[in-house]
Swiss-Prot record:
Region annotation Disordered: where it falls in the sequence: 1-215, 569-596
Pfam families (UniProt xref): Pkinase
Gene, per the UniProt record: nrc-2
Main function: Controls entry of the cell into the asexual developmental program. Required to repress entry into the conidiation program.
Domain of life: Eukaryota
GO CC terms, sorted: cytoplasm; nucleus; plasma membrane
Name of the protein described by the UniProt record: Serine/threonine-protein kinase nrc-2
Length: 623
């Protein structure tokens, strides 16, 4: 189809699709070698790993929640993990400026970014070829999620000055169409003849009836998830602005408290991280990485950050309080510690949507498990705990795939997220014992495919109340992961699972990561599996969740387990630091000419989200 260009020689594309892909990214080349990663735990110092007769590389494991262990040990020579591709256009970086520290690097000098092939853009054939009007219709079908990465210029390959690239606006190059394919992508205008194979279009046949919508209460989601919905300001609060109510969680370097803001009376979950412990355990970069992900993410299934600031001894992340507690605890209260297949499909869909967004942002989550999934008071899920997440190397451009029907109302566009992660591999040995993928155990490096493996384990656990490869000890569990087939109990009283569900689990738990579902086109592979045929992806957050938490009073923490606190953090007595770590009352502190503040890159900001004022107003009138 001939392209239409404006006076500047730029083609046109529906503006809503541009908004869908609004992010930019960058990579900064420099040399630094990360220290040995340490074990994540509730306590205890890390120790080096050692070989065992079983041949597995070992680390010290610590009990987490249900006696499942979390492993965080560096394996081999870690590859480069470059600076996150968060947007220069993102309000957070527009306010703060680009960070000077590459938070995620655990390796040596970064390798050259892989070449990105030209993306061939094809369209439906014959009479199904979309017109300009149907392109606008296609744009309307897209569920607009703010901060979703941009298709053009997502990564930059030649930043000679070491700075991040400028804003990666969706380029106005012409949208190409042909008569021999059912895919739509973005044409890369290069003089060479490179082209990539078009992705097969998902089959949209058989979409079921729309599930009944949830009756929206005043406390349901009201956030505006658009690219302009976040306003970033200098931090407006400090430790003295909050009253501590109760400890609701703890880890090896910090604790999570339910707090109430004195001025507004709003409840928040405040993550308090000890600077001393982070230095001791070499986890500073993880805290900086988590802040960056939280501050730049804007998605209904990812926990919201409102304030970040620091005192002389602590870092503070003030986040949305999810009164439903851990999804793990909700599962434990169900008969058989499991839920029906239809309910598991709903939560698997929400997790898939969250992972799709993270992959578009260039992040590999790497720690999916029920303990890291929180239930919003509306019953929808929210992913939390991003300290183990990893940033990918510069990758390619996402390709949009439309259904065979072209403009059919039942044919929703999907996006190839795999290209955003490129061929990035990391050698870090991280994860939860029963959720670790085979390639992580082998120490051969892993990619974003580990997130789809953990999704398969999660679905299995939701259905059967246990993980599929659990052994009597850690080595037995690892051996089962590497060698055993997936067991589907069929004895009397065992859950009755459909063949489509078993098919999805089998494909997600393929031991060869290159053949695993999601290895070809990322989340689109999962979303187009027949198991999700009746799932209305664009309407998930407006549907009624299977589990709606009992609220009680907001401060009752009914859905959280009791956590014993050995040493309480005095929030109100902490001495607040300035925007870049200097004590407020003392001006710029220079402890030494060559001294470097390791927490200088932790930014103190307040984030305002459109719709929250009305939401909080209703919430606290009902308390």
């Amino acid at each position: 189809m001939p392209s239409t260009k404006n006076a500047n020689g730029e083609g046109h594309f529906p503006s809503r699709i541009k908004q869908f892909f609004r992010i930019n990214s960058g990579s900064k080349d420099h040399k630094d070698r990360d220290a040995h990663t340490t074990s994540s735990s509730h306590g205890g110092a890390p120790r080096a790993d050692a070989k065992t007769p079983s041949g597995f590389r070992q680390s010290r494991f610590f009990s987490v929640g249900r006696l499942r262990s979390t492993t965080v040990v560096s394996e081999g020579n870690p590859l480069d993990e470059s600076m996150s591709p968060t947007a220069h256009a993102n309000p957070y970086f527009a306010h703060q400026g680009q960070p000077g520290l590459r938070h995620h690097n655990d390796g040596s000098v970064p390798p050259s970014p892989p070449d990105t092939p030209s993306l061939k853009v094809d369209g439906p054939e014959g009479s199904q070829q979309p017109t300009a009007a149907t392109k606008e219709e296609l744009a309307r079908k897209l569920r607009r999620v703010a901060s979703a990465p941009n298709a053009q210029g997502l990564f930059s390959k030649g930043q000679g000055n070491g700075d991040r690239p400028a804003t990666a606006e969706l380029s106005k190059e012409p949208l190409e169409e042909s008569k021999d394919s059912n895919t739509v992508g973005f044409a890369e205008q290069k003089p060479n003849n490179d082209s990539s194979t078009s992705l097969a279009a998902p089959d949209a046949d058989g979409l079921g009836a729309l599930p009944p919508p949830i009756r929206q209460s005043p406390l349901a989601f009201r956030r505006t998830y658009s690219s302009n919905s976040i306003k970033v300001r200098n931090v407006e609060v400090g430790p003295q602005s909050f009253d501590k109510i109760k400890l609701i969680g703890k880890g090896d370097v910090g604790k999570v408290y339910l707090v109430k803001e004195k001025k507004s009376g709003r409840l928040y979950a405040m993550k308090v991280l000890s600077k001393k412990e982070m230095i001791k355990r070499n986890k500073i970069k993880r805290a900086l990485a988590e802040q960056e992900i939280l501050a730049t993410s804007n998605h209904p299934f990812i926990v919201t950050l409102y304030h970040s600031f620091q005192s002389e001894d602590y870092l503070y992340l003030c986040m949305e309080y999810c009164s439903g507690g851990e999804f793990f605890r909700a599962l434990q209260t169900r008969p058989g510690k499991c839920i029906p297949e239809d309910d598991a499909r709903f939560y698997a869909a929400e997790v898939t949507a969250a992972l799709e967004y993270l992959h578009l942002m260039g992040f590999i989550y790497r720690d999916l498990k029920p303990e890291n999934i929180l239930l919003h008071q509306s019953g929808h899920i929210m992913l939390s705990d991003f300290d183990l997440s990893k940033q990918s190397d510069p990758g390619g451009k996402p390709t949009m795939i439309i259904g065979k029907n072209g403009t059919s109302t039942s044919s929703l566009p999907t996006i190839d997220t795999k290209s955003c992660i490129a061929n990035f591999r990391t050698n870090s040995f991280v994860g939860t014992e029963e959720y670790i993928a085979p390639e992580v155990i082998k120490g051969s490096g892993h990619t974003s495919a580990v997130d789809w493996w953990t999704l398969g384990i999660l679905i299995y656990e939701m259905l059967y109340g246990t993980t599929p490869f659990k052994g009597k000890n850690r080595n037995a569990t690892f051996a089962n992961i590497l060698r055993e087939d997936i067991p589907f109990p069929d004895h009397a009283g065992a859950p009755q699972i459909s063949n489509l569900c078993k098919s999805l689990i089998r494909k997600l738990l393929i031991k060869d990561e290159n053949r695993r579902l999601g290895a070809r086109a990322g989340a689109s592979d999962i979303k187009t599996h027949p198991f999700f045929r009746t799932t209305q992806w664009a309407l998930i957050r407006h549907m009624k969740p299977p589990i709606v938490p009992n609220q009680g009073r907001g401060i009752d923490t009914l859905n959280f387990r009791n956590v014993k606190e050995s040493e309480s953090v005095d929030i109100s007595g902490s001495r607040q630091m300035g925007l870049k770590g200097e004590p407020l009352e003392s001006g710029m502190v220079t402890p030494g000419e060559n001294a470097v503040d390791p927490f200088e890159e932790f930014n103190s900001v307040t984030l305002h989200h459109d719709g929250d004022e009305e939401y909080h107003s209703d919430a606290y009138e009902k308390r």
